[in-house]
Design a protein with these regions (language model features):
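Acidic ATP/Mg2+-coordinating residue in the GHKL
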Residues: 124
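A conserved beta-strand-to-alpha-helix junction within the catalytic ATP-binding
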Residues: 41-54
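Short helix-loop "hinge" at the ATP-lid/N-box region of the Bergerat-fold HATPase_c
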Residues: 96-98
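Conserved micro-motifs of the catalytic ATP-binding
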Residues: 34-39, 76-81
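Short beta-strand/loop element within the Bergerat-fold HATPase_c
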Residues: 104-116
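Short alpha-helical segment of the dimerization/phosphotransfer core of two-component systems
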Residues: 14-19
């Protein structure tokens, strides 16, 4: 195909991804705001860091932004929540950090284990926070969709997690989520937290959403 045709096809792909993301976020926000029941289950929060690690090569290639991960004292760390929503939370936080950065910028995703739970941090060296309270004023998330921060807050609220946004020392923003351990982590090591089939489906869904987000950020 000639250049104008390729450009038109690319524009269609991007707009389709944008509509799909907006619909997905709006539906999720509706479910969260209307208190639709959600079965909380034990899951290994360290899996979030592994998903961030898999995103890094595509992010650097497409956006020229480095995404670095770090785990400190974290092995298997079981918390209560909805794994799908935890992954959505991670994707929103990473996307916002990427949106704040220029090419050549850096994003850090770290997970630290504490006696009472785990702490996930997503930090960037981008433009930093607005002077207003970002949680109260719906800081722009996900390339201006204005849904992401409220989604993150509601996900954390119903799972019993704590979300905070602060200025990062040296510039940029730090988003932090504190996960309390599931019932003192009184779960036997041999317990299967989720089925292999369910994990495979969730992994594929997360990969698709991550690719979609990177595509949209590339045109932001």
């Amino acid at each position: 195909a000639d250049l104008p045709t390729r450009q038109a096809l690319s524009d269609i792909q991007i707009e389709s991804a944008r509509v799909s993301r907006t619909v997905h976020n709006a539906m999720l926000l509706y479910r969260l705001e209307n208190g639709e029941p959600c079965e909380l289950q034990p899951f290994d929060v360290s899996e979030l860091l592994e998903k961030a690690e898999r995103m890094a090569p595509d992010i650097e290639k497409s956006l020229e932004i480095q995404l670095m991960t770090e785990r400190e004292g974290v092995g298997r760390c079981v918390v209560m929540g909805a794994p799908d929503e935890a992954e959505q939370l991670l994707l929103h936080l990473i996307s916002n950090a990427l949106c704040a950065c220029d090419p050549g910028g850096r994003v850090w995703v770290s997970l630290k284990q504490r006696k009472t739970g785990a702490v996930l941090r997503v930090e960037d060296d981008g433009c930093g926070l607005m002077e207003e309270d970002p949680i109260e004023n719906n800081r722009r998330f996900l390339s201006g969709a204005k849904l992401g921060l409220r989604i993150c807050r509601l996900i954390c609220r119903r799972a019993g997690w704590k979300l905070t946004l602060t200025a990062r020392p040296g510039g940029g923003t730090r988003a932090q989520v504190a996960f309390p351990l599931a019932s003192g982590e009184a779960i036997p090591p041999e317990m299967v937290l989720h089925s292999g089939e369910g994990e495979a489906i969730r992994a594929a869904r997360f990969a698709s959403r991550a690719a979609q987000e990177i595509l949209l950020l590339r045109r932001y």
